[in-house]
């Protein structure tokens, strides 16, 4: 008999604040009591104060059905002009340390000269797609036009493991993601050659090798993409949608289901995502 998995529930936002740090808002949908929410807001506020970060933060909790089950903590803030996010799975609402450590590390990295996040990311559990997973969240986005290195910097700032963007060199939809011996890979829809900067002899190259996928992205329907992700237990799947010709990103969620990121319209915005 297979062990029963804890089911995570996304709660509607109902912000709580700590009197000491009123600009730190905690959204738990009422699942966290007032003292728990205030304790979390105070802990996050102290990290921000210690690092000299102003402007507050938004903390979102995704909690299990059972009172003592796992909790996903997501913290969004801004450091200077850079949007920042830290996300950590914890043992429960009273287990704040993993989220606070990750938040502190994200702030330190954002305040220094950029370099890729350490790889492998041992504190983070690698997600896979269960056989019964369904698409439960759809995120239409305007993709940003960026170089692969700019996309990697945005991915690291937002604490993602994969990031969908429009490649500035080819105009194709593409993803950068964490995998392989170097920790960084690039997949474009059609072109499989390395980015232009890697083919020149400039004295300053990228900080780490970027491995480019040697095969074009598969052309699939959404249903076929879901089937492939389930069959192989993939953490995510980048594919070209058969109907629109645009790159789409199917990704595994902590609740055991899938999210789907789809580009909106035909245009792209300049800059980082």
Swiss-Prot record:
The keyword Secreted does not apply. GO terms for cellular component: cytosolic small ribosomal subunit; peptidoglycan-based cell wall; plasma membrane. One of its GO terms (molecular function) is ribosomal small subunit binding. Induction: A member of the dormancy regulon. Induced in response to reduced oxygen tension (hypoxia), low levels of nitric oxide (NO) and carbon monoxide (CO). It is hoped that this regulon will give insight into the latent, or dormant phase of infection. One of its GO terms (biological process) is negative regulation of translational elongation. Keywords: Virulence. The keyword Electron transport does not apply. Involved in translation regulation. Inhibits protein synthesis and decreases bacterial growth when expressed in E.coli. Can also stimulate macrophages and peripheral blood mononuclear cells (PBMC) to secrete important cytokines that may be significant in granuloma formation and its maintenance. Increases secretion of IFN-gamma, TNF-alpha, IL-1 beta and IL-8 through human Toll-like receptor 2 (TLR2) signaling pathway. Interacts with human TLR2. Monomer in solution. In vitro, binds to E.coli ribosomes. This is Dormancy associated translation inhibitor. It comes from Mycobacterium tuberculosis (strain ATCC 25618 / H37Rv).
């Amino acid at each position: 008999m297979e062990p029963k998995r804890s089911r995570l529930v996304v709660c509607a936002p109902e912000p709580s604040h700590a009197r000491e740090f009123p600009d730190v808002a905690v959204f738990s949908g009422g699942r966290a009591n007032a003292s728990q929410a205030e304790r979390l807001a105070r802990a996050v506020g102290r990290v921000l104060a210690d690092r000299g970060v102003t402007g507050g933060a938004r903390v979102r909790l995704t909690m299990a059905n059972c009172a003592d089950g796992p909790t996903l903590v997501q913290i969004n803030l801004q450091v200077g002009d850079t949007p920042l996010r830290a996300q950590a799975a914890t043992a429960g609402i009273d287990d704040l340390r993993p989220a606070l450590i990750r938040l502190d590390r994200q702030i330190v990295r954002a305040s220094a000269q950029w370099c890729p996040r350490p790889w492998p990311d041992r504190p983070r559990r690698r997600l896979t797609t269960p056989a019964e997973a369904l698409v439960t969240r759809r995120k239409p986005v305007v993709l940003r036009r960026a170089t692969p290195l700019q996309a990697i910097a945005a991915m690291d700032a937002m604490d993602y493991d994969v990031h969908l963007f429009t490649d500035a060199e080819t105009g194709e939809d593409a993803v950068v993601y964490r995998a392989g011996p170097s920790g960084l890979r690039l997949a474009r829809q059609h072109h499989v050659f390395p980015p232009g900067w890697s083919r020149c002899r400039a004295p300053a190259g990228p900080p780490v090798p970027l491995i480019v996928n040697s095969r074009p992205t598969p052309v699939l329907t959404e249903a076929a993409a879901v089937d492939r992700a389930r069959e192989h237990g993939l953490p995510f799947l980048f594919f070209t949608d058969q109907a629109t010709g645009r790159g789409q990103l199917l990704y595994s969620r902590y609740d055991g289901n899938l999210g789907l990121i789809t580009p909106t319209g035909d245009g792209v915005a300049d800059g980082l995502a």
